[in-house]
Amino acid sequence: TQGVSAIRFVYEHNYPVIRDTIVSSVYARSIGKEVDGNAPELFGNELAAHIICGGPDVSCHETTTKKEAVEKLRYGVYMLMREGSTQRNMPECIRAITEEVLDSRRAILATDDMLAGDIATKGHMNDIIRRTIKEGVDPAEAIQMATINPATWLGLSELGVLAPGKLADIAVVEGELADMNVSEVFLSGQLVAKDRQLLLPLPAYQYPDIVKHSVKRKPVKPEDLMVKCDKSNPKVNCIGLILDQNLTDAFVEDMKAEDGYVKPDIENDLLPIANVGRHGQSDIGAGFVKGFKMKQGAFA
């Protein structure tokens, strides 16, 4: 599990992160600002401590199991059920509501990261609402999880419902509500999309110069991305991908080394991975990961 044990680990290796986080969190609370974060795999006393530090509206978008979802909802955590292109946690989390019949007012639908192609072909929030309904949630309740629930969590009392005195952008759904086929979109009272066609010009975004020169990095050599080793048959700590999850497995693998470096093992899907800082850091984190199943090439 994470939590206190993770804090100790980070403190041992990079104590300024913990120190700065505590100082900034205390300052934010002192001036009336919200403090929030994630709470993956937290239960019992550790979850309670996280909530006390975060305040009454603390949230988590890293919940991955029904057990976690049940406890967080019972503790009053706003649970953002993630269902994006690569992280798919909603079907497991929603069981806390469909099977345990818990109150859904603190359940929120979220996509986190979505590929542009997925948004174009499947939709965005309308797609996750559609999937939630297929998991057994009433259509009106599923829509609340994407509208009034997040508005309430963020303190945006003027948003989230169609009612006098409220602000609302409107998505018109055609046919069965459960299908979530959006036919028209109104933005600030103006019809901006109809039948999947944009009705107003959308100029290309102009990036400011400051973001065009933000990478501060010395040239990286191939050996900088490799794991040094003085043994010929080392035992190597590896990362294991979990399908549709952000969390990963950790395991030890017998590997081979030559010329002072551990060799990748493509046949067994043990591929090199590196974390290269872009803000002036000199250190590089290098290791091995299993699960990509790539036989050639690379990506960044």
Predicted regions and their residues:
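An acidic- and aromatic-residue-enriched active-site/binding cleft used to recognize and process polar
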Residues: 40, 84-85, 112, 175-176, ...
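Mobile "lid/hinge" segments at catalytic clefts and subdomain interfaces of large enzymes
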Residues: 1-4, 188
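A short glycine-threonine-serine/GTX helix/turn-capping micro-motif
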Residues: 114-119
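Histidine/acidic residue-rich metal-binding segments in metalloenzymes
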Residues: 3, 9-81, 88-109, 120-134, ...
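Flexible glycine-/small-residue-rich
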Residues: 2, 111, 275
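Acidic, glycine-rich active-site loops and adjacent beta-strand->loop/helix elements
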Residues: 85-87, 149-150
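Active-site microenvironment of metallo-dependent hydrolases
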Residues: 120-136, 140-300
